[in-house]
C-alpha cells in the first residue's frame, strides 16, 4: 500500500467511493472498484430494498436533531457568531441528506448519477470542515461577527473547498484531466489531510479561547467529549468495520457507529457554542412567556391608581379610569 491508496481502507469498510476507485475488477465485468471484506445486509421495506438500514436510520435521526439545533440557534437573536454557526449546521444537514441518499441506495452504485453524488458528498464534507475552521476565528473578534465580511468570508471559503473537493473527486472517478481511479493521492489529501488539519486548527483555537478569555472551564468538557466520540467513530469505521460486521451477522458495520459518533460530535460543537455564547438581553426578543415573574401582589392600599385625589380636577372622572385592560384584568 502506498500513500494515498484506498486499498486497505476499502478492504475494511464499505465507503461509497470504494466502488469508484482502484483498479478494474475482472469479477465485476471489468468495472472499477475495491470490494470490502464485509457489507451490512440490506433491509426490505414496502417492496423497497434499503442499503445500510442502520446507518440510514441514524441519518434520519441526525436530520431531526439538526433541525432542533438550528431552531435553537435561530432563537438566540443577539448571540455572537449566530449567522456563522448556523451555516455550519446547514452544511451538515445537506451532507446528511446526501449521505442518506447514497447509503440507503436511492442512487444505487454503478448508476450514472452515483459518481456525482459521491463527489458532492466529498465536497460537502470538505466544506463542513472548512466552515468549522472559519467559525473558530469568530470567537476572537478579529472582525465583527454577523457582518457582510464575516458571513460571506465563511460562505465563500466553504464554497471554494466544496468546488475543489467535488472537482478532484469527479475527475478521479471519471479519469478526466490526467487523473484516474488508480491515482488517488489528490483525493486522499483533500479528504483526509486537509479536513484533519481544519479540525485540528479549530480545536487548538477553541482551547486557546477558553484558556485565555473564559474563567469557566466547563466548555473544555464539551470539546473533550466531542473529540473522543469523533475519534472513536473514525477508529470503528476504518479499523474495525469488517470485524463488527462479521460478529453481528452483517446487521451493522462501522458506518453505523461512525455516523452516530459524528452526530454526537456535531452536537458537542453546538453545546460548546451555546455555552460560551451570551445574549444581550437588552436587545434580544424573548420567545418564552413569563420571563419576568411577579412573586407577590402589593397590598390594596399601596396599589397605584390613575385617579387624581383632587376632586375639583376636570380629569377626576375620566372615562379611562374604569376601562379594563385585556392583559391580566387590571384597571388603568
UniProtKB/Swiss-Prot annotation:
One Gene Ontology cellular component: endoplasmic reticulum membrane
Mode of membrane association: Multi-pass membrane protein
Recorded GO MF terms: unfolded protein binding
Predominant localisation class: endoplasmic reticulum
Signal peptide feature range: none
TM segment ranges: 49-69, 85-105, 123-143, 151-171, 185-205, 220-240, 250-270
Localization per Swiss-Prot or TrEMBL: Endoplasmic reticulum membrane
Keyword Endoplasmic reticulum: yes
GO terms under biological process: cell wall organization; protein folding; protein transport
Record keywords, A-Z: Cell wall biogenesis/degradation, Endoplasmic reticulum, Membrane, Protein transport, Transmembrane, Transmembrane helix, Transport
Xref: Pfam families: Chs7
Subunit description: Interacts with chs3.
Sequence similarity: Belongs to the CHS7 family.
Protein purpose: Chaperone required for the export of the chitin synthase chs3 from the endoplasmic reticulum.
Protein name, entry field: Chitin synthase export chaperone
Species of the source: Aspergillus clavatus (strain ATCC 1007 / CBS 513.65 / DSM 816 / NCTC 3887 / NRRL 1 / QM 1276 / 107)
Phylogenetic classification of the source organism: Eukaryota, Fungi, Dikarya, Ascomycota, Pezizomycotina
Amino acid at each position: 500500500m502506498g500513500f494515498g491508496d484506498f486499498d486497505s481502507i476499502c478492504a475494511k469498510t464499505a465507503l461509497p467511493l470504494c466502488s469508484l476507485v482502484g483498479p478494474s475488477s475482472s469479477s465485476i465485468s471489468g468495472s472499477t472498484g475495491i470490494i470490502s471484506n464485509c457489507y451490512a445486509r440490506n433491509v426490505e421495506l414496502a417492496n423497497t430494498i434499503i442499503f445500510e438500514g442502520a446507518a440510514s436510520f441514524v441519518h434520519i435521526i441526525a436530520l431531526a436533531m439538526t433541525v432542533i439545533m438550528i431552531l435553537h440557534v435561530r432563537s438566540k437573536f443577539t448571540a455572537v457568531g449566530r449567522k456563522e454557526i448556523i451555516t455550519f449546521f446547514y452544511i451538515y444537514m445537506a451532507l446528511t441528506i446526501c449521505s442518506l441518499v447514497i447509503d440507503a441506495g436511492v442512487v444505487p452504485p454503478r448508476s450514472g448519477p452515483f459518481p456525482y453524488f459521491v463527489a458532492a458528498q466529498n465536497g460537502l464534507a470538505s466544506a463542513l470542515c472548512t466552515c468549522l475552521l472559519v467559525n473558530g476565528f469568530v470567537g476572537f473578534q478579529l472582525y465583527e461577527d454577523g457582518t457582510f465580511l464575516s458571513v460571506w468570508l465563511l460562505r465563500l471559503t466553504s464554497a471554494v473547498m466544496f468546488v475543489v473537493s467535488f472537482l478532484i473527486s469527479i475527475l478521479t472517478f471519471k479519469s478526466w484531466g490526467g487523473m484516474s481511479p488508480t491515482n488517488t493521492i489528490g483525493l486522499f489529501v483533500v479528504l483526509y489531510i486537509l479536513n484533519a488539519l481544519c479540525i485540528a486548527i479549530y480545536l487548538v483555537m477553541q482551547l486557546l479561547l477558553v484558556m485565555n478569555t473564559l474563567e469557566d472551564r466547563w466548555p473544555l468538557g464539551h470539546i473533550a467529549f466531542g473529540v473522543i466520540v469523533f475519534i472513536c467513530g473514525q477508529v470503528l469505521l476504518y479499523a474495525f468495520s469488517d470485524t463488527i460486521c462479521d460478529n453481528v451477522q452483517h446487521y451493522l458495520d462501522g458506518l453505523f457507529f461512525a455516523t452516530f459518533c459524528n452526530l454526537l460530535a456535531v452536537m458537542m460543537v453546538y453545546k460548546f457554542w451555546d455555552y460560551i455564547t451570551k445574549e444581550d438581553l437588552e436587545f434580544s426578543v424573548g420567545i418564552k412567556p413569563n420571563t419576568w415573574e411577579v412573586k407577590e401582589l402589593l397590598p390594596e392600599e399601596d396599589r397605584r391608581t390613575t385617579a387624581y385625589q383632587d376632586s375639583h380636577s376636570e380629569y377626576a372622572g375620566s372615562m379611562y379610569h374604569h376601562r379594563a385592560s385585556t392583559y391580566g384584568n387590571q384597571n388603568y
